[in-house]
Amino acid sequence: HAAYFAFSDKAKRSAPGRIIGVSKDSQGNTALRMALQTREQHIRREKANSNICTSQVLLANLAGMYAVYHGPSGVKRIATRIHAFATAFAEVIRQANGENKLSVVHDQFFDTVVVDCGSEKLATQIFENADNIGYNLWRFDDTKISVAFSETSDEEDFKVLTQLFVNTSHQLPETASVSLDQTHLRNDDILSHPVFNSHHTEHEMLRYLKSLEDRDLAMNRSMIALGSCTMKLNATSEMLPITWPE
C-alpha cells in the first residue's frame, strides 16, 4: 500500500528518503529539484536521519499512475461500483431469514461488510466452505466474518458469496445503491491537476510514462547522474580508466 505524508520545513531533516522541492530553472521556469538528498543526509548525519531505502516508492508510483489513467470520473465510477457490491451484499444479509439469524455489524461501510453469524459453529462452517472454494475471507472473531469487495469482484462472486452465507444465490441489483452518510461524501473536486485529466487511453498512458522516463539522466544520454559519490557527474570518457588492468 502506498503511503503519503506531509511535514513542515522545520521537520524536513527528520524525514527519510529524498525530498523533492519546487524551484526555478535558468530560464525562470518552474522546476522540480532535489531539496534534500542522500549525500546531504550523510554529511549532516548528526542533524538528519539516515536515508531509508526508497524501493517502496514503486507502490506509490503505481497508485499515482492508477489515478492518472482512470482520472477523477474513473476513480469515482470504480469506487461506486465497489460500494454497490458491498451495499447489495449487506442488504441480502439483513433480509435473510432462517434458523441462524445473520446480521450486519456496521451501519456505515465502504467496501467491507462484517457479518455476525450468531454462533461460532456457523461462522466456522461458512469460513471453511469459502476457503475450500478459494475465497479468502477474514475471521473477524469467533462469530463474525468480514467480506471485502474490490475492483476485481464480479457478479459471479456475488452469487457465490450470497450462497455461502444465506444458502441462496442472489443476483446483483441492476441499480447501484450508495448507503454512505452524506457527511462522509466529498463534494469538492478531486484530482483536478491536468495530468489526471489527460491520459485515459493505453497509448496516451504509455507515451506519458515514456516522457517521464526520458526526463531521467542515463549513461547513454548524459553523464552518470546516480551511483557512488566517486562516480557522480563524470563524463563517459573519464570513466574509461576504471576498465584498465593497471
For every predicted segment, state its role:
Residues 1-96, 105-107:
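Active-site C-terminal subdomain of aminotransferase-like
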Residues 6, 10, 18, 62-70, ...:
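Generic, well-ordered alpha-helical scaffold segments in large soluble proteins
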Residues 6, 58-62, 77-84, 88, ...:
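Generic recognition of stable, solvent-exposed alpha-helical segments in well-folded globular domains
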Residues 83, 96-130, 149-152:
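Conserved PLP-binding catalytic core of the aspartate aminotransferase-like
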Residues 103-108, 137-141, 223:
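Short beta-strand
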Residues 129-133, 137-164:
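Noncatalytic alpha-helical scaffolds and linker/capping helices
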Residues 155-225, 229-237, 242-245:
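Flexible inter-domain linker/hinge segments
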